């Protein structure tokens, strides 16, 4: 076993754009050999990938430290360990995921055709990763593509070049080179990739770039999964546990120095508890980083000067009052966690996703007002985080939309590796993780198989059409409504109970069994020898 280190690898280099069409052709041709479809092939790739990642763990830890200042602990928690567990989960469950499903909600007259759902791979796919979690957000979708039987090209983010070159090495050493390739680069290389025809594009990043990718994909009717972001609100009522709210929201916002698409972008807090909430935020900050964030080994850096400048400009443009933090250092890309009390929803800190350790607090006096404000700022954020009583949090969830939600926590839903994760509206489309990653790169193919003996029942579909056939057709296909002309339910209590207990399919079979039993009891001849 040889452990890989960063110094063992060549420097980051862009892929020549002239090489990109041949790379695309290579993975497309491989898919059409159908060799990526069998379970054995997929498992072989996943297992080889797992051990290559294990051997490259030191290099991956080094890379995330160099690119983002991440501690080894945080990198393992959110990157390396995450992907290793993802592969193990897929390996253990892949055979089950691949199995055909019996189609649900099929009428009795169609059951003889044995309708089922096959899980077919979509084809050759493109995965475009992001810099903030360069390993998880690149390799997570790739694991889904491999599991689904697709071939793939990965384009990691050029803003995390060290992680990108480690991933390229791992993939080249462990996966089938005819099926899985890496393209390095920035805008020119991404443009060249988008010039190719893919069977699916998976993109993680900003909404601005997501629109460009969606537009290019639409030209060839290529399906996309877009994992974007948004101005995610946390809503803290007067009944919330402020110590817990402060600790959980601060952790969510300081992870990766706030460069997390799903962390809260701002806090709507009941005006009566703002001073105490700020005090609890300060207390939690002191507990997390006793010597301060600048000296803390557990607090990273902003990824590059361009992003640091953007954050600094946001902070400079706010009309709010800085209550905590505010210290910065461009030379080291340090940006202190900064709590700002803002006066209204038009403040600069609430106009755009900060994607950094800025924590604006907007006071409210009425929960309905807070919900209205959150919807006005961004109607479809990636996440929403209500803190309060059950009644209050249920009210918030019932009157807002978001990709996901964590009640009384900061993005816990996004911390569960097997829970489907995705946006809604302009925070994204599609979902992945766990089984959803397999489904993301699979086509649910409906299949029937019509036996010859059923032809006499199918004569209703063949001309000439007669009144007799019409009566037969109605008898075979018409569904009786369970409501009257006034919209009232016509189901009796017993039927409602049976449906809730057995389900529609179960009730059908129960009725058939009862009819059969009655027939046998009444002396039906089954043609069986005694």
Model-identified regions with their sequence ranges:
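Short, well-ordered beta-strand elements within core beta-sheets of diverse protein domains
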Residues: 29-35, 127, 235-236, 266-269, ...
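Residue-level signal for inorganic ion chemistry
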Residues: 42, 87, 149, 180, ...
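Conserved C-terminal structural/oligomerization subdomain of aldehyde/semialdehyde dehydrogenase
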Residues: 38-41, 334-530
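Structural signal for hydrophobic packing residues in well-ordered secondary-structure cores
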Residues: 50-53, 57, 68, 91-98, ...
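ALDH superfamily catalytic-core signature
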Residues: 10-14, 175, 208-344, 407
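N-terminal Rossmann-like NAD(P)+-binding subdomain of aldehyde/semialdehyde dehydrogenases
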Residues: 1-116, 492-501, 518-526
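Rossmann-like NAD(P) dinucleotide-binding subdomain of oxidoreductase/dehydrogenase enzymes
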Residues: 106-244, 491-495, 509-523
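Short loop/edge segments at beta-strand edges and connector loops
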Residues: 184, 205, 324-326, 388
